[in-house]
Regions:
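A beta-strand signature from Gram-negative outer-membrane beta-barrel systems
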Residues: 1-38, 42, 51-55, 62
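Outer-membrane beta-barrel channels and translocator barrels
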Residues: 5, 36, 48, 58-61, ...
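Transmembrane beta-barrel domains of outer membrane proteins
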Residues: 11, 55-57, 100-104, 140-144, ...
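Outer-membrane beta-barrel pore domains and translocons
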Residues: 11-13, 30, 44-48, 57, ...
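Transmembrane beta-strands of outer-membrane beta-barrel proteins
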Residues: 41-43, 63-67, 111-113, 151-155, ...
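Flexible loop and strand-edge segments within Gram-negative outer membrane beta-barrel domains
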Residues: 108-182
Length: 197
């Protein structure tokens, strides 16, 4: 969801060690914090997709939240296709939800709780169906040990599920599922040798 993005950077080579020795390219996306000053939001409504983003302070100006959601409803477009296309009466769509709560204890400490969930599904006939699901949650503590030394500590959980169904022939029908789930933790330290570097 682009409304939730603060910045991003694409590494095609010379990938930093913090990404764990990836041999392919890496797209590093940083989500933004919600506004600690006022409640605000944005919404978009289109022929195929819609989105909504809300953000603002919680309880005081040290805590903020941001929530974003998107969905698509493209089935009606597939239904307009001619019968011979093979896609008429197909079904395709997705939805996702992002949420983040950030609390700044003082100038040296902040805590961020982030969650994400998405679901994609499609089929172009009644025989074969596909569905995908992603979920993640993380807790990040950022601490300034020194004006030039900052540490970031993250723990979290990731989940991915893939499901394929084929009911063309009862004798050969199948359901194939695949999933990955993992807990992780990592620490990253940033040292600025000089105020001008």
């Amino acid at each position: 969801n682009s409304d939730m993005v603060k910045d991003m950077e694409l590494y095609k080579s010379s990938i930093p060690a913090k990404f764990g020795g990836r041999i392919s390219s890496v797209l590093d996306i940083n989500s933004r914090e919600g506004s600690k000053e006022k409640f605000q939001g944005s919404a978009s409504l289109g022929l195929l997709t819609s989105s909504l983003t809300l953000e603002g302070p919680l309880f005081n100006k040290k805590t903020s939240y941001i929530v974003g959601a998107r969905t698509t409803y493209s089935d009606w477009l597939l239904n307009l296709l001619p019968e011979k296309s093979g896609y008429k009466d197909g079904n395709a769509g997705f939805y996702d939800l992002n949420a983040s709560i950030d609390h700044r204890f003082d100038v040296n400490n902040s805590l961020t709780l982030t969650g994400y969930f998405s679901h994609d599904r499609f089929h172009f006939d009644e025989v074969e169906r596909y569905a995908y699901q992603n979920a993640s949650a993380s807790l990040k503590w950022t601490h300034a040990f020194h004006p030039n030394l900052t540490g970031t500590f993250i723990t979290g959980y990731d989940l991915y599920n893939n499901r394929t169904e084929n009911t063309d022939n009862p004798a050969t029908a199948y359901t194939l599922t695949f999933g990955i789930d993992q807990f992780y933790g990592k620490a990253d330290f940033s040292w600025q040798a000089h105020d001008h570097h």
